[in-house]
Structures are given as C-alpha cells and as structure tokens.
C-alpha cells in the first residue's frame, strides 16, 4: 500500500523526464519527453551532427547541455540508448546454465534473450558521457516489442534499417529463429572491433555490374544536383544522395539476409519466409526499396520507425516495472 502511495505522489507532483539518444552515421538523434500527472507536458525531437565538438564520447556538447539541464532541474530524469555491440541470441534457460555472470543480458520475450561480452557492454556506456545511461536496450528488443502484436503463425523476416548498420530478426508467434546485426560502415576503433563474420563486402565485378544497372538513375539525379541552388534543388540534392546511398547498400543488405535465411533453413525445420517487414529509421528511397524487393524476390512491407521514440517507450515501461 505504501509503495502504491509513493508511486501516486511521485506521478502527481513530480515530473518524469525521459531522454533517449541514438547515434547513426554522423548524426545523433534525441527525443525528450516530460510527463507529469500522466500527461505529456513537453515533447521534442532534435538531431545533431556528431562531427561537431564533442566531449569524451559521441554526444555533441549541445546535446549534453540539454541532457544536463533537464537532469539538474528534474530529479526523475532517465536516459536510454540502443546497444551497438555484437549480441548473441540465446534461450533464457540456456543462458542461465552458461552462468556467464560478466555477460549482461537483455530479454527479448519470455523465452529468448541476447547477451553481450562485458567489454563491449562497457564500450557502449562510454559512448554516452551524459551521467549514466539508465536503460541500454538491445535492437532486437526494440524490433520484437514493435511487432509482437502483429506476429503471424508463419515466420517473417523483420529488418531494422539504419544508415550505418542494420539488424534482422526471423520469427513467428512461437519462436525466434535468428537475430543478427550487420555493419555497413567501418566502426570507430574505440567502440567495436570489426570482425570478419559480421562484415559484408561486394567484389569489384558485382559492384561494377550493380552501378551500371542503376547508372541511368544516378545520371539523372546528378544532373538535378548541378542546377542553381534553390530550395527545390536542395531537396533534389538530398533525394539524389538518399537514392545513391540506398541503392549502393541494397546488394549488401540482400546478401546478408539471404545468408541468414539459408542458415536458418539448414538448421531449423521452418516454412519458407515469404515476406520482409522493413522498420525504416532512415527514410529509405522508394527506388531502393523496390530494388530490395526485386533482389530478394520477396514482398517487402515498409513501416516508419523512430528509434528514439521506441527507446523512450521501452524506458517508460521498464521504469514502471521497477517503480517504488
């Protein structure tokens, strides 16, 4: 009873602030939500270039100032981020039997979890010099929480796409068959070592053939980029870069997904996966999306996905679980 009273007083008279961070490519995204008496009093989203001045990590000083101003003004401020370390999918029971005390684990559902080596886990924390990261979530927890109410009896492939990396999960209502992350860009040395099994490369012949195939699209867009610098042409410029970047990554993404599917078909008795659900956090170009669908020869359904928004949703859920 006392616990419930404390919780009610806290929610009624104290603001709770949730601040989430995510670094992708050369941008840091953050969402700030302030809640009081079960009502959202303040909510905003900001992006910062990580190439600008930073302090002992990847968070720009401007973002640090926002974070610290809220934490100083509101005692109940919680920070969340997404793990970028290599994670291993495991059944919870098997993980407990392994007795890996120095391997932090993150639950995906009631049956499965992912764990990371303590060294990689600490590197994740060092990336965000805010105060403490209260909640560090697995990308696979974010994926599963987003799709769990729409899981089907047959297995589907769920793909979370960022500019610098992507994550995919093969699952149905009962099982998770595979969870894997793949880097599209070289990672900072202080963050994670690049490992051969986690990288994807294209040989010169495949790259030349692919670029030749999309050259007409690139030429027409580059022509638009060379016009006078009006507002419309700035949008065309951004559209061109989005297409070129997206189209160049499609063979890499498709190859990794096909490898993952082959490994699951070889090791598990499951039906063929016929559909990909793309959780798009980087606004993939429509032509790149169509190219992915054609390359995989599978239906690809795209959903808008805000990483920082989902991080704050999970942080609020976790905070509710452990509230006094």
Language-model segment annotations:
Residues 1-324:
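Hydrophobic/aromatic-enriched cytosolic interaction surfaces used to assemble or bind macromolecules
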